């Protein structure tokens, strides 16, 4: 087996990125030498992510639907619910517009059927995910060589959380793809003596787009930008001729887009940062202790890759990327409101270190070498025999991550999506007149899945200016029967369908009978509780006289 031969622009380093190693050309183990050309790698990743997208049938977080698809649906079809964030101007239209183009294509081709409307957005996201996979391979190859790149790609595809989350339509997912792409082009991350300014400009463009889509991405690019500023010999040129013009162009473009869509001038990044960082507005949706990312959140995402990532960080001695992970986790730890997806952009970086550890094990087992990037050439072995340690490690990761990925993607919290898919099909057949969701706000997808302009009502949870004031969701959970009875007093005509969790349904059965509702479908939702009491199933009720 070849161990990649490289030229070191900064002396005889130990193979980490801080050693500034570069390619000497397309040798057998150079980029793509292990598993094919960039095109073949991309097509392989795309096929994998398409299957990945089709396997995701669960609900994770409301923003997947309410902050992207719902907005895009309203833009193209003229109806859809805009949450309070859009009324306060803390969201940019840049990300939803990607899906608006998809919806427009489906509209003009007449393909906007219930099934395609449900599946198409995640299939579109699978293209972005595959691009991210390709650039993870390219970045790993630029840093450490083709062997590490192959293992890094394996780790990316085997990680349960990447499988579960990356193909969802969160802005965080596109931010993650742009982060990996951008890091590939920045000279301070990898030595790039050829076409140096062009690479950096591309890196700046991608970084600016990431910040436009997700303003908190500035946490990542502030670190990278300061590192580049420290290392570049021409600091004035970097700031005056590159950062300011490129940043201004991207900011200007997004401001014009938001001006067109909002109808007035809105500086979204400023509003977003003010709400989330200065006023801690996100705390309304719950808080975690400062150490949560370090002791729970990021470790759950890495799962059984954790020891391998730690080993890779130690062995590679790549202080730049390991410090980036630490920086992001530390900054996000300052905020009270924490979520797994907020730190998703640095998960692939941690998986690169896992790939390094696996490549180290492979090389150590096959040639007794102590370094993945050792300059020595070893004759190619067509069939490299894995050491027992390497084989056991691979089996261990697959045995732990595959069941987790499939369970979370196919079973855990699937009831709300199943219920909406059912209602979408019923509405398509003209069997739904109106829907009331008696469950915590944003528990289901909305018009982007139903795709029929019929009256729907859910329980509002807009943050209140009065501290301690209960929103509709909280009021309902405190007293389900009293809240539902108050709603019913104002009905001129009852909704044709009511959707609720089984935990509340048991308290409202008499109410349902009294108002002539009967159960029509029940969907499994979860085996264990997450934030609230166990929501084991989602129940759909229909009023008896809704249809003759």
Swiss-Prot record:
Glycans are attached at residues 167, 382, 490. It is found in: Endoplasmic reticulum membrane. It comes from the Eukaryota. Mostly expressed, mainly in vascular tissues, in leaves, roots, stems, flowers, siliques and pollen, and, to a lower extent, in seedlings. InterPro entries: GPI_mannosylTrfase (IPR005599). GO terms for biological process: attachment of GPI anchor to protein; embryo development ending in seed dormancy; pollen tube guidance. One of its GO terms (cellular component) is endoplasmic reticulum membrane. Its EC number is 2.4.1.-. Its main location: endoplasmic reticulum. GO terms for molecular function: mannosyltransferase activity. Keywords: Endoplasmic reticulum, Glycoprotein, Glycosyltransferase, Membrane, Transferase, Transmembrane, Transmembrane helix. Disruption phenotype: Embryo lethality at the globular or earlier stages. Compromised pollen tubes micropylar guidance, but normal pollen germination and tube growth, associated with an abnormal localization of GPI-anchored proteins (e.g. COBL10). Impaired apical plasma membrane localization of COBL10 in pollen tubes, important for the growth of pollen tubes in the transmitting tract of pistil. Lost A36 plasma membrane and cytoplasmic punctate localization which displays a constitutive reticular localization. The keyword Glycoprotein applies. Residues 1-23 are annotated as: Disordered. The chain crosses the membrane at residues 41-61, 98-118, 146-166, 169-189, 204-224, 238-258, 260-280, 294-314, 320-340, 342-362, 392-412. It is a multi-pass membrane protein. Mannosyltransferase involved in glycosylphosphatidylinositol-anchor biosynthesis. Required for the pollen tube micropylar guidance and embryo development by regulating GPI-anchor mediated protein localization (e.g. COBL10 and A36). Belongs to the glycosyltransferase 22 family. This is Mannosyltransferase APTG1.
């Amino acid at each position: 087996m070849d161990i990649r031969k490289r030229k070191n622009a900064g002396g005889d380093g130990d193979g980490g990125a801080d050693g500034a190693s570069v390619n000497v050309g397309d040798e057998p183990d150079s980029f793509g030498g292990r598993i094919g050309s960039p095109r073949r790698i991309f097509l392989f990743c795309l096929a994998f992510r398409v299957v990945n997208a089709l396997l995701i049938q669960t609900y994770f977080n409301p923003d997947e639907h309410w902050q992207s698809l719902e907005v895009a649906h309203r833009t193209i079809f003229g109806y859809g619910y805009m949450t309070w964030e859009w009324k306060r101007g803390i969201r940019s239209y840049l990300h939803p517009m990607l899906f608006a183009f998809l919806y427009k294509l489906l509209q003009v081709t007449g393909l906007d059927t219930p099934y395609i409307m449900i599946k198409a957005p995640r299939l579109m996201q699978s293209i972005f995910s595959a691009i991210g996979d390709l650039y993870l391979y390219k970045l790993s190859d630029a840093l450490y060589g083709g062997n590490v790149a192959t293992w890094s790609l394996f780790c990316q595809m085997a990680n349960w959380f990447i499988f579960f989350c990356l193909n969802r339509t969160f802005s965080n997912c596109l931010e993650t793809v742009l982060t990996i792409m951008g890091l590939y082009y920045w000279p301070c991350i990898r030595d790039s003596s050829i076409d140096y300014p062009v690479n950096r400009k591309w890196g700046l463009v991608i970084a600016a787009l990431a910040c436009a889509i997700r303003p908190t991405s500035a946490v990542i690019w502030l670190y990278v930008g300061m590192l580049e500023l420290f290392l570049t010999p021409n600091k004035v040129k970097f700031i005056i001729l590159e950062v300011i013009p490129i940043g201004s162009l991207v900011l200007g473009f997004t401001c014009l887009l938001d001006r067109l869509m909002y109808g007035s001038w809105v500086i979204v990044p400023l509003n977003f940062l003010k709400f989330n960082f200065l006023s801690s507005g996100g705390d309304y949706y719950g808080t975690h202790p400062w150490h949560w990312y370090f002791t729970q959140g990021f470790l759950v995402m890495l799962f059984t890759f954790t020891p391998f990532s730690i080993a890779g960080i130690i062995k590679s001695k790549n202080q730049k990327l390991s410090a980036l992970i630490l920086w992001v986790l530390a900054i996000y730890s300052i905020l009270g409101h924490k979520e797994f997806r907020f730190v998703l952009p640095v998960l692939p970086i941690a998986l690169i270190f896992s790939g390094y550890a696996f490549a180290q094990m492979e090389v150590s087992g096959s040639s007794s070498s102590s370094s993945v990037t050792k300059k020595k050439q070893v004759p190619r072995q067509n069939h490299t025999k894995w050491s027992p340690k390497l084989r056991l490690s691979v089996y261990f990761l697959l045995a732990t991550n595959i069941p987790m990925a499939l369970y979370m993607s196919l079973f855990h919290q699937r009831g709300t999506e199943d219920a909406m898919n059912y209602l979408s099909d019923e509405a398509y057949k003209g069997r739904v007149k109106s829907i009331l969701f008696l469950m915590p706000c944003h528990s289901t997808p909305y018009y982007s899945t139903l795709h029929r302009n019929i009256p729907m009502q859910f329980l509002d949870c807009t943050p209140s200016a009065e501290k301690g004031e209960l929103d509709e969701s909280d009021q309902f959970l405190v007293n389900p029967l009293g809240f539902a009875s108050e709603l019913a007093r104002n009905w001129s005509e009852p909704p044709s369908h009511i959707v609720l969790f089984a935990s509340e349904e048991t308290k409202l059965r008499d109410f349902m009978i009294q108002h002539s509702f009967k159960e029509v479908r029940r969907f499994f939702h979860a085996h264990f509780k997450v934030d609230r009491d166990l929501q084991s199933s989602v129940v759909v009720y229909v009023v008896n006289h809704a249809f003759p």
